[in-house]
Amino acid sequence: MNLNKMYGLFLRHFYLIKSSLPRVLDLIYWPTIQIILWGFISKFFSIYSDYYNNTLGIILTCAILYDILFRSSISFNMLFLEEIWSRNFTNLFIAPLKLKEIIISLIFTALIRTLIGLVPAIILTSPLFGVSILKLGFPLFILFLSLYIFGITLGLFVSSGLMRYGPSFENIAWSSLFLLAPLGCIYYPIEILPEFFKVIAKGLPLVYIFDETRNILINGLVDYENIKPAYLLNLVYLIFGIGLFYLSFLRARIKGTLINMGE
């Protein structure tokens, strides 16, 4: 594994972001708008609802955590789409880069994009709504890491589809997370779901992460045993995602679709 090659690919995408104000604004705009929107919705419920006392803090914190998942997955996909749109996809795989080096570079670049988008939104929540996600303390890192891993895994799935089917698979990149959101039990407990959907939801790491988030915020206690299933599922999906990425690359290379990508 060559660190210089991975660093070179990282720099390529980093300078694309750094040299383009619209790209930076795009990274900041959506999470900021989402946090502000959900902040006002949460504030409404905190005034007019007796469901639980800390409605604002719970819903807004869950919204921020969901955006970690959303940003990480979309950022990974965007890096792949950038290569397609700039017609650099073929050059990427002609370059003396191993697939694992490409994956690792994209993972770290996606992390930078995610943080650029989320940090301003997180900072705004405290003066606007009196909510700070940082009050979660160390458990925040555990929750963040799990959501980031799952986001990257979804990115691997979508990127595999882009390699296999080309730009026509692009719509899946934008819709995949919205399809999972209702089953992820982000803003409500799993008990709300019908029995059939509960079975599916239990196979998603999101359910365990957001359930424990609500537990921490409501009871002030953290139970790491409740988070373990999320990490076990993440491990299974990540291994499968990496395997699918390699398989899609091999099939695309055999069929020659990598050459025509982006044309």
Model-derived features with residue positions:
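Hydrophobic transmembrane alpha-helices and immediately adjacent juxtamembrane helices
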Residues: 1-263
